[in-house]
Amino acid sequence: MLEVNTYFDGTVKSIAFQTATLPATVGVMAKGEYTFGTDCKEIMTVVSGELIVQLPNQEEWQTFIDGQTFEVEANQSFNLKVPVETAYLCKYIR
């Protein structure tokens, strides 16, 4: 069953689903800055657009564009700058 999630007053929306192997969400972020927390390990892929990411315990920011992936371990938080509306796929490792 699909589940729609809305965050940050509607500027981030995702649809949760089950892949063949892992739970996942696919969503869109409006331009802005966000902080997300993880309950489990997350593998995030940019589908379209750009994410500028500050990973946990890192001072520098890294840019990810279409097709690029980054990972965040469980029980961490990470910061995002979204310069253009961006679509993403997030897989959850439980």
UniProtKB/Swiss-Prot annotation:
HAMAP family in UniProt: Nucleos_phosphorylase_PpnP
Pfam families from the UniProt entry: Ppnp (PF06865)
Reaction catalyzed: a purine D-ribonucleoside + phosphate = a purine nucleobase + alpha-D-ribose 1-phosphate; adenosine + phosphate = alpha-D-ribose 1-phosphate + adenine; cytidine + phosphate = cytosine + alpha-D-ribose 1-phosphate; guanosine + phosphate = alpha-D-ribose 1-phosphate + guanine
Gene Ontology molecular function: guanosine phosphorylase activity; purine-nucleoside phosphorylase activity; thymidine phosphorylase activity; uridine phosphorylase activity
Keywords: Glycosyltransferase, Transferase
Name listed for the protein in its UniProt record: Pyrimidine/purine nucleoside phosphorylase
Summary of the function given for this chain in its UniProt record: Catalyzes the phosphorolysis of diverse nucleosides, yielding D-ribose 1-phosphate and the respective free bases. Can use uridine, adenosine, guanosine, cytidine, thymidine, inosine and xanthosine as substrates. Also catalyzes the reverse reactions.
Lineage: Bacteria, Pseudomonadati, Pseudomonadota, Gammaproteobacteria, Cellvibrionales
EC number assigned by the record: 2.4.2.1, 2.4.2.2
GO cellular component assignments: cytosol
Gene: ppnP
Residues spanning the signal sequence: none
Native species: Saccharophagus degradans (strain 2-40 / ATCC 43961 / DSM 17024)
Family (UniProt): Belongs to the nucleoside phosphorylase PpnP family.
Superkingdom to which the source organism belongs: Bacteria
Top EC class for this record: transferase
CDD domains (UniProt xref): cupin_PpnP-like
